[in-house]
């Protein structure tokens, strides 16, 4: 994204909190945010890790979401990532 690291990191942390995810760890030094999202239907806990890396005057954001239980997540984790990145993009505009 076209924002410096500090600004992007703050936006990511704010969006994680806005989405109601449980924040487990925030480390600006490592550029890492760890959180847990609980599914609405069954109450399953899914782990989310977001890496924020400064690249010159821009920032790269990587998101990983994984279910703790079950063999298939029925696309929930991919959808969570897509929605998060779309909301992050909208919050910057």
Model-assigned labels for residue ranges:
Residues 1-93:
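Ser/Thr-rich, low-complexity intrinsically disordered terminal regions
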């Amino acid at each position: 994204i076209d924002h410096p690291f500090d600004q992007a990191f703050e936006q990511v942390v704010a969006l994680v909190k806005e989405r109601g995810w449980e924040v487990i760890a925030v480390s600006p030094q490592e550029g890492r945010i760890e959180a847990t999202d609980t599914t609405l239907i069954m109450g399953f806990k899914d782990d989310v890790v977001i890496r924020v890396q400064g690249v010159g005057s821009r920032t790269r954001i990587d998101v990983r979401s994984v279910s703790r239980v079950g063999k298939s997540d029925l696309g929930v984790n991919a959808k969570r990532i897509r929605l998060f990145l779309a909301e992050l993009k909208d919050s910057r505009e």
